[in-house]
Regions:
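Short, charged/polar N-terminal "headpieces" of proteins
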Residues: 1-23
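Short amphipathic alpha-helical surface micro-motifs
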Residues: 5-10, 35-36, 45-46
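Long, contiguous binding/interaction regions
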Residues: 20-23, 27, 73
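A short, polar/proline- and glycine-enriched secondary-structure boundary/capping micro-motif
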Residues: 24, 36-37, 50
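Helix N-cap / beta->alpha transition motif
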Residues: 27-29, 68
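Short, surface-exposed linear segments at secondary-structure transitions and domain or protein termini
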Residues: 31-40
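Acidic, low-complexity intrinsically disordered segments
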Residues: 40-85
Length: 85
């Protein structure tokens, strides 16, 4: 289960309950949100989909505890192609 809680316009707390519970702090720059979604989905939904993407590739215990969303593409080059609308 993935739970996303908004802290402010760019920062979110994410709780993942799979193989134990982990907490993550994720920052989503406005321009990156626009680039990936063209404004068609919310930042919360983008983060949820991004964590689903990550969980298909690694356990929640391996996901960084705090990161900017663009960092995902440094580890998984296919991320932007896969997640974008």
């Amino acid at each position: 289960m993935i739970s996303v809680e908004k802290i402010d316009d760019k920062t979110f707390n994410v709780t993942v309950n799979k193989s134990g519970t982990t907490q993550h702090k994720v920052t989503v720059p406005d321009d990156y949100h626009q680039k990936l979604t063209k404004g068609q989905i919310s930042k919360k939904e983008l983060i949820k989909r991004s964590f689903e993407f990550l969980l298909e590739r690694e356990p929640n215990t391996s996901i960084l505890r705090s990161f900017d969303l663009p960092v995902i593409s440094q580890y998984f080059p296919e991320y932007e192609r896969t997640i974008g609308v």
